[in-house]
Each structure stands twice: as structure tokens, then as C-alpha cells.
Design a protein with these regions (language model features):
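Conserved PLP-enzyme active-site core in the AAT-like
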Residues: 59-212, 218, 224
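Long, intrinsically disordered low-complexity tandem-repeat segments
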Residues: 36-57
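Conserved small-domain helix->loop->beta segment predominantly found in fold-type I
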Residues: 202-256
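N-terminal intrinsically disordered, low-complexity tails
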Residues: 7-39
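Long, highly charged amphipathic alpha-helices
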Residues: 4, 8, 197-203, 267-270
């Protein structure tokens, strides 16, 4: 019975292509998935089989494009906490694109437009999901397996001088950084995994939305979700792996399902066994 229901939900995921303008005036393909809207970026995703030799300078340039930044620098991991502390002391707020329980999409564009100095940490969700600097964030902090031991700090075009100076004080030249031999494959695999987890979360959210024991579901990709409009204009490539839900027998108590890149049917069946 459960297997049949899982198959029904999964098989109902039909992709219908279309296009829409993103928040920066670019185009995205919009896929309607049985009430769940999936945003697919037009940036070509690097795959595990598409591994090429790159320099650290090229890696940095890739993040400038992804985040919509004006420039980017490599900062040793050992200096990151000190850099963030300096920025916070100067009035910056460090946020993530997806945060809170129940999960919601941070309004980077709205908060930046209101004058808030934002540093967006995209190390968890992946820079490919959030064009943070294009949306107005002063900085975006990313991680990449090709440059282990460093973070990529992306700076908005016309970055506030003191913020740029704080970054430059901790940064090193990309020309002095050697790309890890296996880093390209690891990074490509991580991106594929994140996208697969996001796709799985779409199905899990749709499944939980019609579950007889579930009182409420929060997932940015559901049309009924409070963050849906913001998610479709500020995220690209998917809505992340987090699905929060509330059992009818435990009102007010949120639980989190974190999707993975494994087969979604198996994830749902395991969820039911544990639940």
C-alpha cells in the first residue's frame, strides 16, 4: 500500500517547461511539478564526467559569475572567523539563503534594499543555488573542494570600501594557490549531489503535503508555502534539501526531513518506517 502511494506521488512529477525572468533580469526555465515549481538555472552545471584542469584564478572567476559579484578573493579558512567577526562588529548581518525551523528563504533582496549590510554564507546550500551578490548582499562566502583550506569570498560590485579592505587584509593571491588534484571531481560530485537532494525534497514535500498524519508542511518549493514567491525569485536550480513538517498528534512541534541524493522512493519508505 505504502509502495503504491510512493510510486503515485513520484510518478505524478511531470515536468512542463517554460521561461520566466529572474530577479536580476535573466531567464530561467520554470518546471511545474504537480503543484511544486522547480527553478532550473541556465548556467551549465559541471558534472562528474566534465572534469578539466583549472587554476585557482579560474575557480574564483566561476564564483564571481555564479553569485553576481564584482570580484572575489581566496581567504584561508583559519582567517574566516576573524573576518566575519570584524564585519559583524561593523554592523553586518551573516545570513544563509535557507534558515530557521520551519525553513524559510532569507529575503536577501528586500533586506539589502532596506539598507542592511548582508554577508551571505552559501557554504551549506551551495553558491549555485543563490546569486547572493546580484540580489544585493555585500559579500557571499562559499567553499570549493578545488581550493581546500580556503573559502571564496565574493564581493558585490561597488562593495563598501571598508568591507573590501577587510577582505583584502585576509586574502591571498589566487596565483599562489594550487588547485587540488582531485578537487574538480569532488566539487562536481558535490554539486550533482546537492541538486539530486533538492529534486528528492520536491517529491518528499509533495508526499507529506497529502499525508494523512501530517498537519502542516513547509518547503519553499510548494505553492502554498509562505516563502514560495521569494524562493522563485531569489533561488536558482532548486529549493534545497530541507522539508519541515508537523504531525497532527504533536501540534506546534516541527520536525525536519533532510533529503539526500539517494533514490527518493527509498527515502520515503525509510521515513515511514522510522516515523
Amino acid at each position: 500500500m505504502l509502495s503504491a502511494l510512493v510510486n503515485k506521488v513520484s510518478d505524478k512529477v511531470q515536468v512542463m517547461g517554460g521561461t520566466a525572468q529572474d530577479g536580476a533580469g535573466g531567464t530561467k526555465s520554470v518546471c511545474a511539478i504537480d503543484g511544486v515549481t522547480q527553478i532550473a538555472t541556465d548556467v551549465v552545471t559541471q558534472t562528474v564526467t566534465d572534469v578539466v584542469t583549472q587554476t585557482a584564478t579560474e575557480v574564483v572567476a566561476e564564483y564571481v559569475k555564479m553569485t553576481g559579484a564584482g570580484r572575489a578573493r581566496l581567504v584561508p579558512v583559519s582567517y574566516v572567523d576573524e573576518l566575519l567577526a570584524t564585519l559583524i562588529a561593523g554592523g553586518a548581518s551573516v545570513v544563509e539563503p535557507l534558515a530557521g525551523v520551519p525553513v524559510e528563504v532569507c529575503d536577501i533582496k528586500g533586506r539589502a534594499a532596506a539598507g542592511e549590510l548582508l554577508v551571505v554564507d552559501v557554504r551549506t546550500i551551495g553558491a549555485e543555488f543563490s546569486p547572493a551578490c546580484r540580489l544585493g548582499a555585500e559579500l557571499a562566502v562559499a567553499a570549493d573542494a578545488r581550493v581546500p583550506g580556503y573559502v571564496v569570498v565574493c564581493m558585490r560590485k561597488c562593495c563598501i570600501p571598508w568591507v573590501a579592505e577587510a577582505v583584502e587584509a585576509k586574502a591571498c593571491s589566487a596565483e599562489d594557490v594550487t588547485v587540488a588534484a582531485t578537487g574538480a571531481e569532488e566539487q562536481a560530485s558535490a554539486r550533482v549531489s546537492r541538486h539530486a537532494a533538492s529534486d528528492a525534497a520536491q517529491v518528499v514535500a509533495a508526499y507529506l503535503a497529502c499525508h494523512p498524519r501530517v498537519e502542516a508542511v513547509r518547503y519553499p518549493g510548494l505553492k502554498a508555502d509562505p516563502s514560495f514567491a521569494r524562493a522563485t525569485s531569489q533561488l536558482v536550480g532548486g529549493f534545497g534539501p530541507y522539508v519541515d513538517y508537523m504531525w497532527k498528534e504533536s501540534p506546534g512541534e516541527w520536525h525536519r526531513f533532510t533529503a539526500t541524493d539517494e533514490d527518493v522512493r527509498a527515502q520515503i519508505i525509510n521515513f515511514e518506517r522510522l516515523g
